[in-house]
Amino acid sequence: MRILKLTEDTRKDILQNLLKRSPNNYGEFEGRVNAIIEEVRNNRDQAVFNYTKQFDGADINAGNILVTEEEIAEAYEQVDTTLLAVIRKSLVNIKKYHEKQVQNSWFTTEDGIILGQKVTALATVGVYVPGGKAVYPSSVLMNIVPAKVAGVDRIVMTTPPGKDGKVNPSTLVAAKEAGADEIYKVGGAQAIGALA
């Protein structure tokens, strides 16, 4: 990570350099990402395992890719009670917000005419939560809670493991609290390809 010290003397140069960066300059990555997704499409789980080893340094296989209830219980033991309270309070707030967005399928006009459209939740949703060196329990909540409120039946979450093959405890606790049905230890483009 590069740390920039913003002072009156450096402010102008730093801001100009930041503004020069193009948000649409993805050309160098697009080819690599497409190749990974194609490899996952063709070689399925084995490609996911290979890329997880290559990018995350973790030995993931069919026997350990799915987070177990034991791993979740262990995560609860490792998470500070203050963080758990914050996760639970945030979950309640996010849920209340999204409950106000739920659409009714039908409504009645002043004349008594029933109008509307059938609003139906998706059966399954895939949620990708970044991980690695940083931890994002808020991303877990902001993705899973709206899906739960919408009535999604099955929520599958992926997040990268550490080199030890484990997922950050706060990420697991947030996922359990939010209602993830399955959590897989895989990140990056290979996770997106597998979800698709």
Each model region followed by its residue ranges:
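An acidic, phosphate/nucleotide-engaging active-site surface
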Residues: 114, 191-194
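N-terminal Rossmann-like NAD(P)+-binding subdomain of aldehyde/semialdehyde dehydrogenases
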Residues: 1-122
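Short acidic/polar active-site loop segments enriched in Thr and Asp
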Residues: 44, 153, 181
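Positions that flank functional sites
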Residues: 55, 162-163, 190
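Glycine-rich anion-binding loops and their surrounding alpha/beta cores
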Residues: 2, 185, 193-196
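A glycine-rich helix N-cap at a beta->alpha junction
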Residues: 171-191
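Conserved small-residue-rich beta-alpha loop and adjacent elements
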Residues: 108-173
